[in-house]
């Protein structure tokens, strides 16, 4: 029986997604205008946010760009926000978009060096606990200077490299052969080709390392003003420079960092929350053989490429630490330097570098349209006003918790931006003192960065990982990410809130003032045009 036009429409709509998912998205598109016009724009706004979170949670059923984009287009069409407000949000976050377009592509051209370094780390260090700690620490260090997305892009590149090497050899091919590592584990006769238990164990091992690395980016990213995009925004509003930002954050970030590393050790030691997966001996042997094979066939030309990439890595860290240009422009310089000095001049070879990041860049632009709805419908206004009604230490704790809860379900760049703007308005209105504003800025920054590891919605790096080509290969779903992040979420959130609650933040800040490590700022300084560079 031939397919009817309506069946063809449903079949084409959102492609291979499950039928129930397609019906859910169509239902959302019907419900939203009814809620907006006949119930309340405020209710419709929150429903839209929840629907968008649903599309993110179902990222493995359907990439969120299409369903989320349809919801966003409808929101603009019915007047929940305007196209100009969406454009304003994209303009305000241009650095984040440039970061995604250029920095992630730049890292693609440095992956030989990164694969070299991390392969040595995994082949030379046999202890799983030690490898986990190394990945967590390396990610934390890198993300203090690079954006967390950049670091996760690095780790994803490394993991895909490991997975494809194993898949290629286990499928009976040599290292140099072409091979599709995304194919199912069957040969031409339809028989299983790969050892299923071995493959599952290796997937578990890679999942563990990626989650440790992901949390590592949060641990390091909260410490410096270049660690996360929202840190830049908060530092600019408070007129803090690189050193002052790190010092002011340290009463919260140092205890949290220590607790995070201890959590990494404990979950691996006791094999809880899905951790403790070991690297099978057979896989370890393949990776060691590959390492030896690569070392043996490495020519002077190849060695020169690694040296050039190492120098570019130094420029990358120095350029970001000293804030010599915006993050995206430094990423563009990395692309130019890496391709020019390593002889990559073919347009098609350049194009491959952008494949990973551009769908996510488009998704982020769609997310900014949801942010525009949140602003136009003032969805967060009641929470912010309630928090400002409290005083002193209680106010700091409330802002930390309120930031944390909203960052778990919303983009932390947005949450941080909204809160720091509201608090700055309160400062200029005389509701709070300048010293209280500085403490609130610390609470907002740490509250935005730390509890948001709970879900991929809060951490852009986690969302990038979830929607990457690697996630389905290693069976890393939304639910599994939330479960594996849970011990970190609990520990980081509690240690962070305790550092504020017991007065440690206030006492240490006073100590820094007394020892002249930092100086008191005036309200007048907050009126000066904010500069992030």
Curated annotation (Swiss-Prot):
It holds the Pfam family NhaB. It comes from Shewanella oneidensis (strain ATCC 700550 / JCM 31522 / CIP 106686 / LMG 19005 / NCIMB 14063 / MR-1). Belongs to the NhaB Na(+)/H(+) (TC 2.A.34) antiporter family. Keywords: Antiport, Cell inner membrane, Cell membrane, Ion transport, Membrane, Sodium, Sodium transport, Transmembrane, Transmembrane helix, Transport. GO terms for cellular component: plasma membrane. GO terms for molecular function: sodium:proton antiporter activity. The keyword Secreted does not apply. Its main location: membrane. This is Na(+)/H(+) antiporter NhaB. NCBIfam families: NhaB, PRK09547.1. The keyword Transmembrane applies. It comes from the Bacteria. The chain crosses the membrane at residues 10-30, 67-87, 96-116, 131-165, 209-229, 247-267, 310-330, 355-375, 396-416, 454-474, 485-505. It is found in: Cell inner membrane. It catalyses: 2 Na(+)(in) + 3 H(+)(out) = 2 Na(+)(out) + 3 H(+)(in). Na(+)/H(+) antiporter that extrudes sodium in exchange for external protons. InterPro entries: Na+/H+_antiporter_NhaB (IPR004671). It is a multi-pass membrane protein.
